[in-house]
Amino acid sequence: MADRVDWLQSQSGVCKVGVYSPGDNQHQDWKMDTSTDPVRVLSWLRKDLEKSTAGFQDSRFKPGESSFVEEVAYPVDQRKGFCVDYYNTTNKGSPGRLHFEMSHKENPSQGLISHVGNGGSIDEVSFYANRLTNLVIAMARKEINEKIHGAENKCVHQSLYMGDEPTPHKSLSTVASELVNETVTACSKNISSDKAPGSGDRASGSSQAPGLRYTSTLKIKESTKEGKCPDDKPGTKKSFFYKEVFESRNAGDAKEGGRSLPGDQKLFRTSPDNRPDDFSNSISQGIMTYANSVVSDMMVSIMKTLKIQVKDTTIATILLKKVLMKHAKEVVSDLIDSFMKNLHGVTGSLMTDTDFVSAVKRSFFSHGSQKATDIMDAMLGKLYNVMFAKKFPENIRRARDKSESYSLISTKSRAGDPKLSNLNFAMKSESKLKENLFSTCKLEKEKTCAETLGEHIIKEGLHMWHKSQQKSPGLERAAKLGNAPQEVSFECPDPCEANPPHQPQPPENFANFMCDSDSWAKDLIVSALLLIQYHLAQGGKMDAQSFLEAAASTNFPTNKPPPPSPVVQDECKLKSPPHKICDQEQTEKKDLMSVIFNFIRNLLSETIFKSSRNCESNVHEQNTQEEEIHPCERPKTPCERPITPPAPKFCEDEEATGGALSGLTKMVANQLDNCMNGQMVEHLMDSVMKLCLIIAKSCDSPLSELGEEKCGDASRPNSAFPDNLYECLPVKGTGTAEALLQNAYLTIHNELRGLSGQPPEGCEIPKVIVSNHNLADTVQNKQLQAVLQWVAASELNVPILYFAGDDEGIQEKLLQLSATAVEKGRSVGEVLQSVLRYEKERQLDEAVGNVTRLQLLDWLMANL
């Protein structure tokens, strides 16, 4: 059944309810399965009803809203859920029968609580983990500031940028500062509505550019390490620190270190005491520092992936030569190492608890990953605009479109390295550069779906033909083609069918034409396309005769060629032979094209527009000609076939005519025998069959409607198959495609109706059995669950729903209710609307303190 079900407006009739009592000799093999449609539908229905009772009357189920898992939990109580049990009953001499059980159980109330600390809930663990993470980040930030602003460090580069003041001179450092500032500002605006827990007011404050200053600092620290031996020279280690920090001008007027910055501008630093939330300030500044460090680490691999040779003064020069290439990985490694050490010092004994450590790491890396990913996305966009958004010179512009894809992948964590645990960032940026000399040309009219599909299939057919082209001697092909049309005789001519022309044709001219094999592929598919497009343009409302006459007047006439699509015209021009084609060859080509056209026209007429006269007079001939036709639809006017099965002479005649290829199909196949290989013919015929489905799907009498009209009510449990089911199906034994269609239709019919054919002797029809193991639940919930199961089974066209294992009289009441509903002709939508009214009345009574007198089943018996 469809995924979208309008339960409240459903007109499906309700099913009957029975009591299931298993026999003594039935073995029950219980198995768990969670991929059942009835349970999924029941979970959707449950959620929709709960939304409706809560006041969301306009809510409807959307696909993807709930993913079905082993247990579908209640939104109100997390301890309850649905589950499904399957069991197979196997008897000797009979196939196994599949039964399923829908159960409602309770889980222990402490099943989902983590054993952390003194038994606190998982929310408390998350709260304290976030607080400790903020503290660790603040301590790491303090450590970084001490390293960067220490007296032993040598400042290599420092720049300052203010949002509301004019930019300084355009130096290399200024370009870097502008880029980073704009990137972080854009990132702050984008993520202001999606802040991580505990992020405070950094995101909202950073979106106001005039109130912010941004500082980028690059310092170097040299440390001397003595050698193990006295004669060894002391080793020198250089560490670079790159810091980028937001600073607010409204927090104070203190100078940094008592010194003025370049350009007579003052750097204001915010004191933690002036902030309302110290943890928000810590996590904001700490994550910004961490994210910028991670961005530096990412840009190393990005530049290596791009393999860019930069020779100008863009931002890539600074990122490549001064900051990123050598020192970003060390900064990130030191930062994470510092985090872990400080975390161990702060938490103490809690670090021995693996669950607590995992929670802290997950919280920390989720925050850091989100911020770093947002900043990375903005920086990549800006970097691409600087490096690639340039106008190409005229000498490299091409007539065709250019498409370049750059995959930007960051470094990932090394295996077995605890410092880089869970550190895995990836970013992809794809861009397409389209340069076309003919971009100023007038835009063509938008093509329809049929035209687009036709051109695509034409291109694919020609492409396959070029790969599989095998040339044969022209005389042999011509002889084969000249003799083929005479093999077919029409016993009962029909005005809708046109016989192929029989004209003497010189073999040598045929050889010249047949060498141009592309025209065969093109003409075969274009013929069907033009017919289909014309039919779609008319809306599929014209009769068979007028359709074929109009198609014949617009396709392959004797005085002018057909109007193919523009793509086909271009291909014909490119593939025309260089020598001049004589008039005789043109005439022969038109004759051959008319052969193909007549075949397509007869194909469509036999597939779609068979009239009653054709069915009565040409049953023998058309039955042999339908084997290659895809039997998707039947005629607009139902054919009057006899109720009895057809005589076996059809199958014998089919074998006599050559098996799968017969009639016009065999004629054309013989014509194309030596012109194309068998695989190419198969591809072309398959393409034409698929195109014919377009007309078939647009007809007014689909197979399902014919099945319902002719087969009657197939939902009756008394008859597994209606007697006249085969009236609306293809005859057995008339072809592989029709046999597959017949089997598919019967399978779908059985699945929708809950039947599987006439059961063998001694076997029972499969039963849908429901067993609810919710002993601790209330009677009200049990009754509501039983009603919902009954409604879901009715929507799935289950004839009888059996309940097993009831001790509180619910089965007896539900039996009476179902009998009453079936007698009154109630639908699924009416039952659900009554359930909603009862739930509203019950909630109103509980709100004012009244006690509901009637249970759900009793109320439905009185008011349904």
UniProtKB/Swiss-Prot annotation:
InterPro entries with a match to the protein in the record: AKAP_110, AKAP_110_C, SPHK1-interactor_AKAP_110
Keyword match Phosphoprotein: yes
A GO term, aspect molecular function: protein kinase A binding
Ranges of biased composition (kind: Polar residues): 204-218
The keyword Transit peptide appears for this protein: no
GO CC annotation, single: sperm fibrous sheath
UniProt record similarity statement: Belongs to the AKAP110 family.
Function summary: Structural component of sperm fibrous sheath. Required for the formation of the subcellular structure of the sperm flagellum, sperm motility and male fertility.
Official protein name in the record: A-kinase anchor protein 3
Organism this protein belongs to: Mus musculus
